[in-house]
Amino acid sequence: MRTIDLDASQWRNVSDLYESILPAIGAPEWHGDSINALIDSMIWGGINQIHPPYRIRIMGAKSLPEKIRKEIDHLKTALASHRSDSKRWYGKDVEVEVEVTP
């Protein structure tokens, strides 16, 4: 599985998360900056230049503000849920995950 490393040590706002993830997965310029938009493109859409399987590893997360940690947790939960839906509905596992390291 391909790993995409992101350095979160300088992130201060939730927008920093999206400003790092979107170019890393080759999202088009018009891509939305929300969890729903990420789920649509990562699991369902196929519009990004980087296609599954891949893991996004967020490094340097130990000092992230709480609002960013919550957004990442929400993203991880949503990805797992939609992966499960894809398996159940279409018999296909879309291998995309987010890992967080201190």
Model regions: which residues?
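Short acidic/histidine-centered micro-motifs embedded in hydrophobic/aromatic stretches
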Residues: 41
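A short, aromatic/hydrophobic, helix- or strand-capping loop or linear motif
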Residues: 31-35
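N-terminal intrinsically disordered, low-complexity segments enriched in P/E/S/T
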Residues: 1-29, 44-102
